[in-house]
Amino acid sequence: MKKIILSFSLISSMSVFSQEHFSGISTSKRGGLLSAANNPAELANMTTKYEVNVFNFSVAMANNKLSISDLTSDDNIEDKLFEGNDPVNLRLDTQFFGPSFAFKKGKWGFGLNSSAYLKANVVNVDAKLGEAISNGELSNLFTQTSLSSNENQRLNATTWGELSFNVARNIMDSPKHKINVGTNIRLLFPGAYANFSASNLNGTLVNNFGDISLINASANINISYAGVLANDFSDKSNYNEFFSQGINGYAFDLGFNYRLKDENDANSYKLNTGLSIKNLGAMTFKSDNNLNKNYSLNIDGIESLDINQFENVQSMEEIEAILNDPANAGILQTTSSSADLKIKLPTVINVYADLRLHKKWFVTGTINQKISDDTKSDLTTTQNSYSLIPRFSSGWFEAYAPLAANEISGFTSGIGFRLAGFFIGSNSVFSALASDGKQADLYLGVRFGF
């Protein structure tokens, strides 16, 4: 278990992130496939007849405990991660957009995208419980620590691939106004999944000179996995399976776009706004080792659960073996067990407005608001984010400086550039380097239109 928790932390620290991917470039005046991933209606605003996406890549991490200086210092990451009383929250999110193509025909825009996703999360984990599992000790003395949480504490990871069909249509185009609608139809290819969670955990951790046990406790526990993520969590190659289970899910995005045109400049606008609802769908994992099992934990009297037995666990299968150990039969009862594993995507509302201030100067405001409770064990996770992005935009060059806030790591600031079809940026490079920022990210890509 120690290695599982640290694997999430180290993978996230090596592959660092902000939840709002491609911030700045996805609302660029240039438009195209990246803008359509943000809002499918934007595909009708393509500035070229054809667009080819070679690759786009975004990798990012946000957390509420570890700063960039912590990761580069000689201090023990475990100690920093479980320091204080606030629950530990960490989000890793990686997106790969592979070869993709889009074209315009009359009032229509069409696109075909290939993509792959990795998410790994630590959600609302009690710091003292995490310290006990990770370190195997709360101190060298005899201590008792109360645990009381109404949250669903989770360790969770998901990989999957997608093939997306994009359709947009212009439904109004006057000298001053333009309105588009669109949809993304996404075929989902589950890769691998793992979840270990404990909801409504109440009890007492007892440390008897390094022997940690849980007494007088109750909780609802879920363990579920599919594919290679049932195996060693510290093996990063297990996070590379994206299309292994074929088409076993569907999702949809819906979008609306309004543009106040600039009558004196056909290549620009005064205002561009959009509203999209994303991730309406779910996927079903169908690997041979599928498991979705729920337990009821009830410990009273002289009974206890030995926490030390989780210390060196490296896989979900090992955790399941401990939970099913006859020695724990009196305190852990199976309430349901199934091979069915259906995981929902986190539905998000995306709203943005891009205002032209003067000639080539713009400012964009965006809101990404989740409308699903992603603390539930059958959902992948996301987070709310808000950004303000001043931008200079010419035909072949753009520079922008995202200022953002999200619910996990707080305020961030970064910078990005586009030179013809190549772009590179970070939503948080300034805040990460100038202070104890708890978020970092990088994205880049190559695309061209003709």
Q: What is each residue range found by the language model?
A:
Residues I4-S13:
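Sec-dependent N-terminal signal peptides
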Residues Q19-F450:
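Subset of outer-membrane beta-barrel
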